[in-house]
């Protein structure tokens, strides 16, 4: 049995003990002591000619850019929503609204660092991150190593199991026509 397996088993055992003690549950989902949390995030932005396209904090094109209030990094926006969802803290629009000029042109990295800092303060750490990009262009494969390195650096851990994959919509809808780009992110958090 590995150290991670032992830690997981101990966490599950502790969770079962807490439930069997019939402790009252706090209505704030973030305060419920569960050993693991899973969150899913999604983001989509229309694309326009010119500017630059950032994915996971990496410039992947200087031919197209997202129509967005901030820098429009769909990977980081989906990641923030996944982290917020796992903790039961709402969504990115509640925390960084596009109606607030403070976030106009903001680097999405700030959103990730702010939210993940709060997640860690609440006693959780990221174990796993899985990202799926949906885009006709640009092709993502050449950028995947840099994107993964950027995500790990942003999250402060080389040890996070992270994956980035991409697909197309086979010419269907706005994504398939190259008019938009989208990302899904799934995170698994563990109680520290």
Describe each region flagged by the PLM.
Residues 164-168:
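Pyridoxal 5′-phosphate
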Residues 176-192:
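C-terminal edge-of-domain segments
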Residues 1-34, 192:
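Short, basic, low-complexity termini and linkers enriched in Ser/Thr/Gly/Pro
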Residues 32-145, 154-155:
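RNase III-family endoribonuclease catalytic core
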Residues 171-173:
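Mobile acidic interaction elements
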């Amino acid at each position: 049995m590995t150290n991670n397996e032992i830690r997981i088993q101990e966490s599950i055992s502790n969770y079962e003990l807490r439930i069997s003690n019939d402790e009252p549950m706090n209505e704030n989902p973030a305060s419920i002591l569960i050993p693991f949390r899973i969150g899913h995030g999604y983001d989509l932005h229309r694309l326009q000619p010119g500017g630059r396209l950032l994915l996971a904090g990496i410039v992947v094109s200087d031919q197209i850019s997202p129509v967005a209030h901030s820098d429009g990094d769909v990977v980081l926006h989906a990641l923030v929503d996944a982290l917020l969802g796992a903790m039961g803290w709402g969504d990115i629009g509640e925390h960084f609204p596009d109606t607030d000029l403070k976030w106009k042109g903001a680097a999405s990295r700030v959103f990730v660092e702010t939210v993940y800092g709060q997640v860690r303060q609440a006693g959780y750490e990221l174990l796993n991150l899985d990202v799926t990009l949906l885009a006709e262009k640009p092709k993502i494969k050449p950028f995947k190593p840099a994107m993964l390195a950027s995500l790990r650096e942003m999250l402060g851990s080389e040890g996070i199991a992270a994956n980035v994959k991409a697909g197309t919509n086979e010419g269907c809808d706005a994504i398939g026509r190259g008019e938009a780009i989208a990302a899904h992110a799934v995170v698994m958090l563990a109680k520290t």
